[in-house]
From Swiss-Prot:
Entry PTM: Phosphorylation of Thr-72 in the switch II region by LRRK2 prevents the association of RAB regulatory proteins, including CHM, CHML and RAB GDP dissociation inhibitors GDI1 and GDI2.
Names of required cofactors: Mg(2+)
Modified residues (Phosphothreonine): T72
UniProt protein name: Ras-related protein Rab-8B
Length: 207
């Protein structure tokens, strides 16, 4: 059977339990919102294929449990991720403070050039806000990461967040392929995973 996509990108949603990772995933993958989701047990993923610059991108989006007791399960999936969304709840100060801990986990376990984005979720609940948008923006700037406030309930910025992350990954892939070709490699390239956690995730190999 012919392949129905040009690229496969593996993405992770990480953050504390209850920040809305599963709701974001369902809003993007199925355009659905459900307030009765129970806390995610282990890890699950959804698929959605999008189009960017004439290319079909298959997004495999993993929803990882935020509770401390599942952290080892989450860690096993960092190495395969090409993009990671760090999610906090704007009505929960602690979930925002813990973003720094999640970033340290990424730095320890993920590839050095994985694309990252911080999402301040539940922005529809502005009357219960504990974390200002400015604080979220400042944290993102400090780490050199893009930032958006989102709402799975109202669908605010959900599409934009996933499309932005996918575009950043695609831009990086294209740049690396161009660098390989300009270095005299020539011919088609295949993107493969580099298992070393402190080196680039992306390697270009001649087919």
């Amino acid at each position: 059977m012919a392949k129905t996509y040009d690229y496969l990108f593996k993405l992770l949603l990480i953050g504390d339990s209850g920040v809305g990772k599963t709701c974001l995933l369902f809003r993007f993958s199925e355009d659905a919102f459900n307030t009765t989701f129970i806390s995610t047990i282990g890890i699950d993923f959804k698929i959605r294929t999008i189009e960017l610059d004439g290319k079909k991108i298959k997004l495999q989006i993993w929803d990882t449990a935020g509770q401390e007791r599942f952290r080892t399960i989450t860690t096993a999936y960092y190495r395969g991720a090409m993009g990671i969304m760090l999610v906090y709840d704007i009505t929960n100060e602690k979930s925002f403070d813990n973003i720094k801990n999640w970033i340290r986990n990424i730095e320890e376990h993920a590839s050095s050039d994985v694309e990252r984005m911080i999402l301040g979720n539940k922005c529809d609940m502005n009357d219960k806000r504990q974390v200002s948008k400015e604080r979220g923006e400042k944290l993102a700037i400090d780490y050199g990461i893009k930032f958006l406030e989102t709402s799975a309930k109202s669908s605010t910025n959900v599409e934009e967040a996933f499309f932005t992350l996918a575009r950043d990954i695609m831009t990086k892939l294209n740049r690396k392929m161009n660098d390989s070709n300009s270095a005299g490699a020539g011919g088609p390239v295949k993107i493969t995973e580099n298992r070393s956690k402190k080196t680039s995730f992306f390697r270009c190999l001649l087919l």
